[in-house]
């Protein structure tokens, strides 16, 4: 059936009365290496200023105050090549996606030398092998899922496939395509995939440098998609017959569930074009919600669009995000922990689950480990983080990228 376009002309006209210009054409999610500077060098965390509206906290400078909870960083694995995502297996082993197209196995906290799978990817810009997730019933079917930039008859597309790990864990075979023809560009490819508490697969996509696609429910770009483990559209999706679940996204790489029906979603803001920069954000979202891009990107309230919970005026940008559910750091319990790339820290955000308002936000590990890409809770109740220092935008150490455990 023909699906409605949720971008209303009335909303655009109202915004034109509020702002000086309409949103410009998109550029990269992060500044290229040659011109990139550290947000924290410009504004130390201890000197940040925040302003809170009725429903949105604006961090006007810096990233947030320095966190006061003592935490400890443990190196779990080194020698990885841009580890983009982690999928924990029932026995606590990890499958790790390396952006160049390799799936690796970490067994008993040791990186296995054998490559589990090599996927033919296009890793230009922000493409490549991105997210990875294990089937909820992995113990019986050995299925895992990957999001990657594929070459389809000479034209790149973003795709989600299902693979099956061998019993020995030394190899994997492709099973099927789950979602295909997700729009692709050099930048803004999204890429995070996770299974929700309902057993469905959620897929975060970018706007592929075409902001209008984020508001078009007929496009898979700039969305969070929701499909069954076999790639079918669930009957209770908000747009009939469509995998589209949440719209109005620029380039999400992180989301997690506060309850069965509510997600906290991080998103990249504008990249500096025509005077706009930063404005990375976290929003509280449910099925059918519109997070506003490109109609809104600040702490703005517009009818029919979700007002962000928090907006950082200076760029983070956010990578993976996880709600802390462990006991090792009890002060963090229930907080959203966001990995920051350019700003090189972990951001802790405390959001009231009832009102959606930010109660507290603070910075940890500032500059200690460089660029941080993924953040995910492990089955042991600990937080795991991947570094992204060898992605061409950081300083790649001799031991390459790492998986870190954040504990007490």
Regions found by a protein language model. Give the residues of each.
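C-terminal motif of bacterial Sec signal peptides marking the signal peptidase cleavage site
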Residues: 18-20
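Asp-box/WD-like beta-propeller blade repeats and closely related beta-sheet repeat scaffolds
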Residues: 159-194
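Surface loop/turn motifs at the tips and blade-to-blade linkers of beta-strand repeat domains
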Residues: 75-81, 116-124, 179-185, 243-247, ...
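Beta-propeller domain segments
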Residues: 47-62, 127-129, 137-139, 207-362, ...
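Bacterial signal peptide processing site
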Residues: 22-24
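A short helix->beta-strand "capping" segment at the edge of beta-propeller domains
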Residues: 59-81, 173-174, 308-309, 359-361
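Blade-loop segments of beta-propeller domains
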Residues: 112-135
